Regions:
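C-terminal accessory segments of proteins
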Residues: 1-239
């Protein structure tokens, strides 16, 4: 079982492990393993995973697709260091960027996709974090069992979009946002919130409204929205 911890509660060794592993992922091949993950996220013509780019289908796939995306990335991390994990940025409580990440400079050579040309991305941020979602808003969402899945994912994706925009810079560009290591911590927090809502017995059985073909989480066929429904089954939790 992998235990994902808050980015603000990592030991110095855990901080260094995360940075060392993603650096190793970004120095292996051409394109690097890290850049390949960025390319998957950017290829939204084939991998609808957001309401912004995929309409109703993308909105329904947003949470399960990114859950699988993070799991695949974390698995790749653990092939380099079995003790590695993706920390989460609890932005409604820790209303600042993780300080140990601030001095870390990162550059990714992003491969071309059908929608983007190849580019060199030097990660930058322009944080204006006063408007981050609040603890009260997130607590209300996590405990709101009156919502159906469509309502829940719509609200959570909206909060997610707000965080991307308030961090700014690389995170503010949906096509290249995974170049910023903060992306993984942000989406781990989104996934953590989702897992809390899913754990409420009143929400059991609430699932994305998708046809069988759209329920397949490409490019990871045969993964589907149902095979990633439980983080316990997937082998990780949030602590």
């Amino acid at each position: 079982m992998t235990h994902r911890k808050s980015a603000f509660e990592l030991t110095a060794a855990e901080q260094n492990r995360f940075l060392q592993v993603i650096t190793a992922m970004n120095t292996d091949n051409d394109p690097t393993l890290y850049a390949q993950f960025v390319g998957i996220h950017a290829d939204m013509r084939h991998h609808m995973h957001t309401g912004m780019g995929g309409g109703a289908v993308g909105r329904q796939r947003f949470l399960p697709w990114h859950r699988d995306f993070l799991l695949k990335f974390e698995t790749a991390m653990q092939q380099i260091d079995p003790a590695a994990f993706i920390p989460y940025w609890h932005w409604s409580t820790d209303r600042a960027l993780p300080p140990w990440l601030a001095e870390f400079n990162f550059t990714v050579i992003v491969p071309a996709t059908d929608m983007t040309a190849p580019q060199i991305v030097n990660v930058i941020r322009h944080p204006q974090l006063d408007g981050l979602p609040t603890d009260a808003q997130i607590s209300f969402l996590e405990t709101n069992s009156r919502m159906n899945y469509t309502q829940f994912t719509g609200v959570l994706e909206g909060y997610h979009n707000t965080v991307h925009n308030l961090v700014g810079g690389t995170m503010g560009d949906i096509m290249i946002s995974p170049c910023d290591p903060l992306f993984w911590m942000h989406h781990a927090e989104v996934d953590r919130i989702c897992s809390i809502w899913q754990a409420d017995p009143a929400n059991q059985g609430k699932r994305p409204a998708l046809s069988p073909i759209h329920a397949i989480l490409d490019p990871w066929d045969p993964d589907t929205v149902d095979t990633v429904a439980s983080i316990t089954t997937l082998g990780y939790d949030y602590v």
